């Protein structure tokens, strides 16, 4: 009997110690994003392969002179002057969106800023990753719309790094009276810009987006249909300048 009591006490004590050492969901996610390099476009050059349902665009980004894009190929051939002009105009518009301030509803500087850390719920715990659901947050005009969305992210166990982040709408809704959003899906895949794979005990640093996906199906005024699907992958990263210490 005494041995049984001791065994039970030891088991209970181990549970208490384990609970004390366990990280909260917000701590896990904050740690997973610590390695994200929010200034990666100031340091790294890379290729972008983008498919928009009509054409496949292959371009190269360089951080020189504040960020330069060069269109290399379109559908495997040399681009026309019109395609080059269209590409550069779109990239400039993208740059303006990404650098817009909070009041203009620009995207968050770091992906973690789109997560309400108080709403994290562990959905899956596998041998390789932890998958959490969350409620996303937006800025400016996007704040109200984000309340209708649901988010999901995955943290890799081998190095405690973020793997992907998704935001989607569980069901159709009207962000405005005259607009119905049937489908919204946004996904970012993250990883190291080098070819080194994550290993047990590896550190989580210099994490950048390696792929993006965006889908939207929207109807405006009951007449205009907007159906967008864009996928992009990023590769061949070259360090332009070493991060300042």
Residues of each region from the PLM?
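Extended lipid/amphipathic-ligand handling interfaces
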Residues: 151-156, 185-202
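Structured extracytoplasmic
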Residues: 22-149, 161, 168-181, 194, ...
């Amino acid at each position: 009997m005494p041995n049984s009591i001791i065994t039970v006490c030891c088991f209970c004590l181990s549970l208490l110690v384990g609970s004390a050492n366990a990280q909260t969901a917000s701590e896990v996610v904050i740690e997973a994003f610590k390695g994200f390099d929010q200034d990666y476009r100031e340091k790294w050059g890379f290729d972008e392969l983008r498919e928009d349902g009509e054409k496949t665009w292959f371009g190269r980004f360089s951080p020189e002179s504040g960020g330069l894009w060069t269109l290399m190929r379109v559908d495997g051939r040399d681009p026309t002057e019109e395609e080059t002009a269209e590409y550069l105009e779109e990239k400039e518009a993208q740059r303006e969106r990404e650098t817009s301030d909070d009041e203009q509803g620009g995207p968050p500087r770091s992906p973690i800023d789109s997560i309400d850390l108080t709403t994290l719920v562990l959905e899956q715990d596998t041998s390789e990753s932890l998958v959490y659901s969350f409620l996303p947050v937006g800025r400016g005009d996007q704040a109200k719309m984000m309340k209708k969305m649901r988010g999901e992210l995955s943290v890799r166990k081998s190095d405690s790094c973020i793997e992907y982040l998704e935001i989607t709408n569980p069901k159709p809704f009207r962000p405005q009276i005259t607009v119905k959003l049937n489908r919204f899906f946004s996904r970012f895949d993250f990883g190291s810009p080098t070819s080194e794979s994550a290993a047990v005990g590896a550190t989580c640093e210099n994490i950048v987006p390696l792929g993006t996906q965006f889908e939207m199906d929207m109807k405006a005024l009951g007449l205009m249909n907007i159906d967008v699907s864009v996928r992009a992958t990023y590769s061949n990263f070259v360090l332009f300048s070493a991060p300042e210490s």
